[in-house]
Amino acid sequence: LAPPINLPKWLKDNASLLQPPINNYCVYDKDMTVMIVGGPNARTDYHINETPEWFYQYRGAMLLKVVVDGAGFRDVVIHEGSFFLLPPGVPHNPVRFANTVGIVIELPRPAGSVDRLRWYCTACEGGVVVHEAAFHCTHLGSQIKAAVQDFAADEEKRTCHKCLRLADAAPAPGSIPDPNLEPGDELRVKEE
């Protein structure tokens, strides 16, 4: 039986473990995967998981970019103190901003399940897929990071077959509006 985790103390003692591009650390990975995730992250992929994912924002707001069948691309803002249950099979890109912290809970992957990371062309209409990586996820903390780094290092994988534009491996600084900022205001999320 694992001891309880005091989240503020854990963050103070282990902030260095939350590193780009994913910024996550698995604190439990037996019956469920429980991750502490910090910001900012640096990823442009959309993760597709065959099981649901539960997001809770402990500090600051995050943006969950999703692709919904029939509705296209949508943004879901998850504010500090709020949680959100993402259904299985929904492509999603978790965007985390500076000084934010959340918790994500996932179920163990069933035998034969396949996780996918998908990159879309931002220049083409209609959700043109630039590249998709597929794998059976056995270690969330390392496999997603490896796939993101592999995409970033390979211009062929990053080239859109339709418009030949090179897809970004990381968002351009300031390209995604931070819900923690108000125009002209200071950052509302405080460092602890």
What are these regions (language model features)?
Residues L1-Q57, A61-F83, P91-E192:
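Jelly-roll (double-stranded beta-helix
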